[in-house]
């Protein structure tokens, strides 16, 4: 016996699965809440913020006072040493603040709060990283603003609006790049003692091996080579160029090194390139640690 079906039977799924969406608003809310927590910690314990302002201010006042009677043309043409030093201290302030950005995350690891965040129903775990980076960038910029105001009393003239934008861009590129490196170290190193030891070892050598305290031609050849490889030297010379030239441009030579002249546009491109490379490397490290 045979059976014939007049209609063709089609199987259709009852459940429909939507493709995953990016909840940008919820991620922004997560970052905002975590940033507020970090700022609340600073409000309750402002010693970190005060130390980040007082230390570079002491460098600016004491080290600048040490060479205040030096001839005006000794370091650069028609520039006093206080004006010469202020650009280096501004970049050094942003560098030091960003270098310490991994400490709050390291303490969260040690006290177990990071584990609570990782087990919380977050939309994205990257909000933990973005909140720490945003917080330390804002904190470093606050410290830089205080040093800029202090440098006005040391002989620096106020910047124009265009110069202020380029100034802020250079400081931001330095801060973001070093912040990403410090956050990666906070996941890589075993504890805060190792991170503090690394910060103490790295901090001053980066300062002395840059053009913050003296120009390149004051240094021996071996130190000139190290300073030419130090990214802080390019950021310092870029800010120094903006302060000393009201009619600056992106193509004029800013710093002369052994392998050529570097312009302001090339300095910004170099810092941006280093940030992109650093972000790629750090993102791979953080993905491996967070997952």
UniProtKB/Swiss-Prot annotation:
Membrane topology: Multi-pass membrane protein
Segments passing through the bilayer: 47-67, 87-107, 135-155, 165-185, 195-215, 262-282
PROSITE patterns: ABC_TM2 (PS51012)
Disulfides per UniProt: none
Cellular location(s): Plastid, Chloroplast membrane
Location (main, coarse): plastid
Keywords assigned by UniProt, alphabetized: Chloroplast, Membrane, Plastid, Transmembrane, Transmembrane helix, Transport
Entry keyword annotation includes Transmembrane helix: yes
Domain ABC transmembrane type-2 stretches: 47-289
Annotated Gene Ontology cellular component terms: ATP-binding cassette (ABC) transporter complex; chloroplast membrane
Family to which this protein belongs: Belongs to the ABC-2 integral membrane protein family.
This protein's name: Putative transport permease ycf38
Organism per entry: Porphyra purpurea (Red seaweed)
Lineage: Eukaryota, Rhodophyta, Bangiophyceae, Bangiales, Bangiaceae
